[in-house]
Amino acid sequence: MLQYPQIDPVALRIGPLAIHWYGLMYLIGFALVYALGRRRITSGHTTSMTVRDLEDLIFYSVLGVVLGGRLGYVLFYKPAYYLANPLEIFYLWEGGMSFHGGLIGVIVVMLLFAHKKRLGFFTVSDFIAPLIPLGLAAGRLGNFINGELWGRPTDVPWAMVFPQSGDGLPRHPSQLYELGLEGIVLFALLWWYSSKPRAAGQVSAMFLMGYGAFRFLVEFTREPDNFLGLLAAGLSMGQWLSIPMVLAGAGLYLFTARPPSR
């Protein structure tokens, strides 16, 4: 068993201001997306997007992630609770975000952005898709530092006891699994795959399939939310939300891979 490195969730204090690691990781995540996107633009990888376009897209995507992530959590995970306590929807400092909701928020942002800039939707989504995984990796590192979203009990040699779980049981460090698979591995695959010209929509399709598949697998080691538990077929909410991602990605890939009709 490995020792869980208990880290103060507050990264920096400036007078009364406390900067938490989790918020800092969000900032680092968006900074990584910007740096990688800027590199691709300035290297001539794309001629459809400018650096100013990237800056605008990231700014609005922050809103999409926060609003979509919060509303997704409210609707997917605790609708009855927030229906009874609607004002708590705005208590963002108490946590409660959904990746799948954040993804929907970003998709809406990309649709509006593409329309405003008169670009094809897949021109935008194929450009941004390979940049997202490292941002996700930063977020999962924030989860690990906070000691939240821990895994299920296990006896594997690298199990850790997360103090916040309250039961003292060794558990999978599932946040690190997600960091590795949904973050680093998915980034490497998409960066390589998108380095060559692809049909419009195929890079986006690979992101949907890759993230959905990795998240589905990791959920087998992640402790289900205690207020939900496992759902139909013994699957978690995260798995049920990931299945449509994989199916949509596969359908999009097959559709865009068709030879043009004559």
Swiss-Prot record:
A Gene Ontology biological process in which this protein takes part is:
lipoprotein biosynthetic process
InterPro entries of this UniProt entry?
A: Lgt
- Which of the seven top EC classes does this enzyme belong to? transferase
Which keywords does this chain's UniProt record carry?
Cell inner membrane, Cell membrane, Membrane, Transferase, Transmembrane, Transmembrane helix
Its chief place of residence is: membrane
Please list the residues that bind a 1,2-diacyl-sn-glycero-3-phospho-(1'-sn-glycerol).
140
**Localization (cell):** Cell inner membrane
Show the Pfam families listed in the entry.
LGT
Q: EC number(s) per UniProt?
A: 2.5.1.145
**Pathway given in the UniProt record:** Protein modification; lipoprotein biosynthesis (diacylglyceryl transfer)
One example of the protein's molecular function in GO is: phosphatidylglycerol-prolipoprotein diacylglyceryl transferase activity
Q: What is this protein called?
A: Phosphatidylglycerol--prolipoprotein diacylglyceryl transferase
**Its encoding gene is what?**
lgt
